[in-house]
């Protein structure tokens, strides 16, 4: 069985094909598998189309490939030129591989290198072309291979013929092959009488001539060719686009030919010898004739000293170049600037210089004296100084205080201190030093240091004296203490000078309260006279029981008003209580249970003002949606001393934009501040007395109701409405029977200030919790469920207590700010006097209870205060 081979060439190329058939070497005997496969694809459906080549059996070797189709065979060691994927390649040593590869180019034939991609047919290289390349290659292999740099040095030094270059020889092979096939195509096109078309083949195969080349020049270098280093089909020639310039539009551009590494122009007029002489020229260089658009050369010059060089070149601040602006500016001639423009530029530069001087950190600017100038003033037209020549100094006397010490200029005064230290505590000397001061010192600004208000100045001086005195242990020194929101309970037992009156001037001597005469000064009671009782039970008392004299006194007396910064356009003040009782005969009696049920409110100066509405506190822990509802209190037969530290009621803070103190800081102050243990806020009103020690009001029905509601809300935690979860109170009473296991929070009793106080535990130890909750845990069926419930309850109680602490701190701060902003007004005929501009300090706190724990009745001081009002007016 014989395989079809490449068709026989036509008579036109007989000079090439016949000689090639007769003188072919041994490598030609073995067909290229690529060629056989291509021929099989073209003639698989044709019978007896291809004529097999005649081969002599004398030169056949036993291991040479036969015409039969064999899929696998052992290759001949001498046959290395055949490169096919069907061959079995055995591993060999490195030296043997290099030796075989070096001889492969010598044994390589002219087949299997070129292919027409349009017709998918292999194209043979003409023998003359291949023979020339083969001979030159032998000569190169016989001599030592030199590098390109050695070749360049040899050509420059001597006139030796350079070695054969592969790139140019490959280009010559490609160009000669394409020219040969173009010539044969032209000759066949002239001979139209001879039919070279096979009558049998439906594929239009011609056996008398090589396949015609397509006008698209689809000749490619096969991937299997050893000349192809990329192992991909590489086009042999690339056609460049035509010239774009009108001068060269009729000129044809020379194409680029593959040279083994890239594409370069092939010199068509050069012969092989001339080609070899021009081997060392760079292969990828292009001549100037290939430029379709010639370079535009413009001689443009501009001054680099020009300040607006960037503007002239069209370069903006972001380094963007505007070529249109650049071209317009460079083409237009630069106009000579006029004289006026130069003058304007000089003025601008002078201004810039002055601004630079002013921007320096130096404090002194030396202005030269025109009389002592070394250079005479210019008398030209520009910048004449005739006006300054006639200048005479003014006759106004200079101020004697302006005495510049030449030695102190440009030097740092190390002895300068600000403010001047005053070691003397005497007020007169301090004022004297302030008024006199360093009059001769130029560094001080001369301003009027007299105070706007004498009372304000005296108050400020008193605070300075208190601050300076080292032996003064007064706890009310006005220092800023972040941790103290209210005064300690120790401040209550101290005696102070003022109650609700502004501080007296420093010129008036302050008389101690213990040794003061009641005729000359007001007797300071232990309870503030501004605190009156307001009880709903007063409606039952007949109007005759109320003293008209006392009522007039209440209208005349100036009571501090509550100043609140509203969030909305609503004035937040309290209505005056209509029922005010004064019983002078009960001076030495204790509080009645009806009066003790209600907190004491500060009466407002206005007669009829809308009431204060509750608001949502800006707390970081809780924001209550509904206001706390408290039922009408009922009397409780119990002394307030037994209830101190036991009642924890919620307070509705009012609309004051004060920052709420954090609960962590509040809880951390419990050890240092005694008032955190003993102060309790009222549930009826958010306004407490001026002593920051709120009153205590408890009634039995409220306690029982709150206690029941609290237990229900805690048991149904997370299931009830918001009112049950948010509205809470912790009433604790000794007389109220309650078991420890009924309470949902853990408390311990501690002795503080000689009293047993029950303290709520937020985070307790495990052993204490086990002891306190032994009874409650017995009711729980599952231990894990009890643990989860207890954790939830602790978390809820912690949030509740922290919210109460926030509210307490907010209320205390609000009261302090209210007391600071109070304005006391006293008028004889009920006429309101103008308020003073000076800031009035808050009234000083007073104790609620005496040393024995009995509450103080404010009514027992009413008569004495009422009698001392005229004397107080005389003092003012």
UniProtKB/Swiss-Prot annotation:
PTM per Swiss-Prot/TrEMBL: Phosphorylated by CDC28.
Query: What domain of life is recorded for the organism?
Result: Eukaryota
Q: Name one GO biological process term.
A: mRNA processing
Q: Which residues carry this modification: Phosphoserine?
A: 81, 172, 225
Does the entry feature the keyword 4Fe-4S, yes or no?
no
Composition skew (Polar residues), residue ranges: 628-641, 685-700, 723-738, 856-866
Q: Where in the cell is it found?
A: Bud neck
> Where is composition skewed (Low complexity) in this entry?
272-286, 659-684
Comp. bias (Basic residues): 135-147, 476-485
* Alphabetical keyword list: mRNA processing, Phosphoprotein
Q: How does it assemble?
A: Interacts with PAP1, REF2 and PBP1.
Name the UniProt record assigns to this protein: Factor interacting with REF2
